[in-house]
């Protein structure tokens, strides 16, 4: 039986470039090499694509083949092409781990759809919606799910933002965050007016749309979702910060200050509620493949959705694979399952595509 060729796309021009490289290295190390042949498609910070062998230690090392995506005279015309060796690369499945802008916001997913390539994760719309906290929270709220209260502010209105107004409706502390960044990039905790103005400048430097939210006093819990039509839900995990602050980019990937508790020490009723909410959120946003749903549990045991991450971190320390490991699915099995889900979803999507003018023929027939 021939192996499937898996293209792991990583890097990119977003602020989460380095996290993406770590995710790719983790997948490359643990992918089932008896079933799959994997190659790395690395996008550097300038947006250039490179082909790398799976046996690597440092993705920043530049011994590689630059590649282009060219139009060819074939039924599905997009192919990966290397400049130095005259071959066309054919991938059976793409595993994208380009976190952040242009990677999990639907841009890369749209390219892969145009290339008719099966890929791991959610489609264009779900990826785009999941990346935009404003839009995703509106959809979740309209579906009857509790989200962290928020107000959205556009860049053109930033000079009319009144600190006292937000304190009157939300109290202190406040959180100010870009609408479309991940890994807590650009997020600030605010306790006074001077900090508020600096937080606005910081958030607007990452996005032209920001969210202002109250602090939810309580616990930060996370749940992993895996599947397409009948998704499975992992056990709940908890992020515990010793200084009672918030889970910053620095805490996640530099200092690694947070303690991760899996499973979370919560009673069965609350655990079941969180898992049900995670499932509903996944379905409301029409996600597929995988997602991580982050919630807050306040002091009254009320659950608020913080965000739905459609392309969660896949590093050795990331919560998503850890949650599944405790739930009985090791990293190799998880990667294999995600590839299988990608192939299954692609087969179903192709049923909706029409070729040879089938739709026009139908309408011509109707008019006769």
UniProtKB/Swiss-Prot annotation:
Which InterPro entries does the annotation name? ATP-grasp, ATP_grasp_subdomain_1, D-Ala_lig_Van_CS, D_ala_D_ala, Dala_Dala_lig_C, Dala_Dala_lig_N, PreATP-grasp_dom_sf
Q: Can you tell me which residues bind Mg(2+) 2?
A: 307, 309
Indicate where this protein resides in the cell: Cytoplasm
Q: Which GO terms describe its cellular component?
A: cytosol
Q: Name one GO molecular function term.
A: ATP binding
Catalytic activity, EC: 6.3.2.4
* Pathway linked to the protein: Cell wall biogenesis; peptidoglycan biosynthesis
The entry's ATP-binding residues are 167-222
Give the main location: cytoplasm
What is this protein's name? Answer: D-alanine--D-alanine ligase
Source taxon at top rank = Bacteria
Q: Which UniProt keywords apply?
A: ATP-binding, Cell shape, Cell wall biogenesis/degradation, Cytoplasm, Ligase, Magnesium, Manganese, Metal-binding, Nucleotide-binding, Peptidoglycan synthesis
Role of this protein:
Cell wall formation.
Cofactor(s) listed in the protein's UniProt record: Mg(2+); Mn(2+)
Which species? Blochmanniella pennsylvanica (strain BPEN)
The protein's matches in PROSITE patterns, at most eight in alphabetical order, are given as:
ATP_GRASP, DALA_DALA_LIGASE_1, DALA_DALA_LIGASE_2
Where, by residue number, does Mg(2+) 1 bind?
Answer: 294, 307
Q: How the cofactor binds, per note? A: Binds 2 magnesium or manganese ions per subunit.
Can you give the residue ranges of the ATP-grasp domain? 137-340
Q: Which family does it belong to?
A: Belongs to the D-alanine--D-alanine ligase family.
């Amino acid at each position: 039986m021939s192996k499937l060729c898996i293209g792991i796309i990583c890097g990119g021009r977003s602020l989460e470039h380095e996290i993406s490289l770590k995710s790719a290295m983790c997948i490359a190390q643990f992918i089932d090499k008896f079933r799959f042949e994997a190659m790395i498609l690395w996008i550097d910070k300038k947006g250039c694509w490179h082909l790398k062998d799976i046996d690597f230690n440092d993705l920043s090392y530049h011994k590689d083949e630059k590649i282009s995506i060219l139009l060819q005279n074939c039924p599905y015309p997009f192919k990966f092409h290397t400049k130095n060796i005259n071959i066309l690369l054919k991938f059976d499945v793409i595993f994208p781990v380009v976190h952040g802008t242009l990677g999990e916001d639907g841009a890369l997913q749209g390219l892969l759809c145009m290339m008719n390539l099966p890929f791991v994760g959610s489609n264009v719309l779900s990826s785009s919606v999941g990346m935009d906290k404003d839009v995703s929270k509106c959809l979740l709220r309209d579906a009857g799910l509790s989200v962290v209260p928020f107000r959205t502010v556009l860049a053109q209105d930033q000079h009319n933002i009144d600190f006292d107004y937000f304190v009157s409706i939300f109290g202190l502390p406040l959180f100010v965050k870009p609408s479309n960044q991940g890994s807590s990039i650009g997020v600030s905790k605010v306790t006074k007016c001077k900090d508020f103005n600096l937080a606005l400048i910081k958030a607007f430097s990452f996005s032209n749309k920001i969210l202002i939210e109250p602090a939810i006093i309580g616990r930060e819990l996370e749940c992993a979702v895996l599947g397409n039509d009948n998704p499975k839900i992992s056990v709940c995990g908890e992020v515990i910060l010793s200084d009672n602050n918030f889970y910053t980019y620095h805490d996640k990937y530099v200092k690694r200050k947070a303690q991760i508790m899996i499973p979370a020490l919560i009673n069965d009723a609350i655990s079941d509620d969180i898992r049900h909410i995670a499932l509903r959120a996944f379905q409301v946003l029409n996600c597929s493949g995988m997602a991580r749903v982050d919630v807050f549990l306040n002091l009254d045991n009320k659950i608020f959705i913080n965000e739905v991450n459609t392309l969660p971190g896949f590093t050795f320390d990331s919560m998503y694979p850890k949650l599944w490991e405790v739930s009985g699915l090791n990293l190799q099995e998880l990667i294999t399952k995600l590839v299988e889900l990608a192939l299954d979803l692609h087969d179903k999507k192709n049923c909706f595509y029409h070729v040879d003018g089938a739709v026009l023929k139908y309408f011509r027939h109707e008019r006769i």
